[in-house]
Amino acid sequence: MKKYFALLLTSILLVTSCTSCVSTAPESEDAPQPSSTPVTSQTKENDTVTLSVYLEAVYTDDEVHFPIYEKLKAFEDSHPEIHLEFVSPVSGASDPAARETEINQLNTEIITGGGPDVFLMQTLRFTDDNLFPDVQKAMQNHSFLNLSDYADANAFDPSSCYSGVLAAGQLEGQQYILPLSFSVPLFVGAENVITGSGYQPEIASANQTAFFEELSRVLNENGKQVEYSLSLTNLLDQPLIDYQEGAIQLDTDAVRQALTIEKDYTTHQLNFFNNYDSQQIDALAAGTPFGLLEMSDIALGTLHPLDTKGIAPFIQGIPNENGGITAEISSYAMASANTQYPEQCAELLYYLMSAECQDAAAYPSTTEELPVRRDSMKASLESAHQFLVYDASKEKLSEDDIAFREETYGGNLQDTTVQSLQAICDQITSAHFHTIWYSALELGQSETGDDVLTSSLNDYLYGDTSLDELIDTLTPRLQMYLDE
């Protein structure tokens, strides 16, 4: 998992050297000022509603032109009756203490009936101080507006989206959270290398165990290794925490098998691959490594240069325990149950689900994600690649810069590659928001000061903790957390 964050940091560097200072919009003159954020929606003028929108500061830099920020401003321009006021805490990387203070302040406001009206969130966390660290528990506690009540008024058609992804934001059949983008687990490599090795994708597609058994067979027979960067327990059909049933599901055959495989592959396979290194791409084309096991947001960094070099890619979705595909939600949006303006909040959120926004990859993310709207796949990938490679601020780049980026990062994906991704996404049966293991659940700290769940998993993967000890230790702690 450490290599996953390293690769993500590489992707973020493509975007910009964004400042991470506080970007909280000024409050209304009539608003009380005990904190740096709007308490609730304030009326700007008699006919204007002000919605406070939580969005991390990195996305609100006017000079970078993130698609999500551009579309939010476009919404505001086309809706003169709605004014958006951004609530953007300081980055934890630049000032951890200040971020902790601001997040605590926001939590206090939310608990007391205030806080932002709208939340635009990314799943990936770079800090332990986050709003709604466990968004599913917050949904169970009815912290968010029931958006199903406003779907028809906003002409939202759920059938236009991947149902397995949408379901992650539902409670008792009602939509409280709108997933905006997601990622799927992929096995990627050079087609001629993998097909020529004797690897049988039909056998591997049966379920997660069958996939790794078939892959291990081929690796052993050919003396090869793969790059492994996954969290398998988050790619199961079954959740580790069943919020609706109030049950912890660590001690199941599927979880035990996934953790056993993860320990094997984490300690015996490669843990880093530079997707943007031309020499490593050429080595991958020659079979060293044999392939990459990555989430699609990282794997796309390899697929672009492979396509550009004319190297036919091999792409297979890594199945869950039941043979389907489990997605990871990358970004999502919701409105506060406390908002005074539910209709306006819903209109904004459903706008982000429209073809206009999904085609533009308008979601809070610093990597290439897949859109929830089915028909937006090709357009969104082209939009995201355009932004990530060119920084959307073309005036900042010289011709030499552009030539270098095009050579290094590749061009748009071939239609056949996009179609392969679409076919994999059509197999999605479930989706989860965040792995429990990293900066997600608040179970306290270990003796070394690390997150308890992260530390416990690492002790199992790299230390002497047995699988039984891991499960027996964490199950009661997680159950206590769930029951709080």
Describe the residue ranges of each PLM region.
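Sec-dependent N-terminal signal peptides of Gram-positive bacterial secreted proteins and lipoproteins
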Residues: 4-24
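Conserved N-terminal structural module of periplasmic/extracytoplasmic solute-binding proteins
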Residues: 18-133, 455, 464-484
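C-terminal capping/gating helix-and-loop segments adjacent to ligand/active sites or protein-protein/ligand interfaces
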Residues: 64, 391-482
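Extracytoplasmic/periplasmic substrate-recognition and gating elements
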Residues: 88, 305-394
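Hinge/lid segment of periplasmic solute-binding proteins
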Residues: 121-184, 311-319
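Short, solvent-exposed loop/beta-turn-alpha elements that line the ligand-binding surface or hinge
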Residues: 145-160, 204, 240-258, 317-323, ...
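Extracytoplasmic/periplasmic solute-binding protein
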Residues: 167-189, 207-260, 286-293
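Glycine-centered hinge/linker elements that transmit conformational signals in sensory
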Residues: 215, 219, 245-278, 303-318
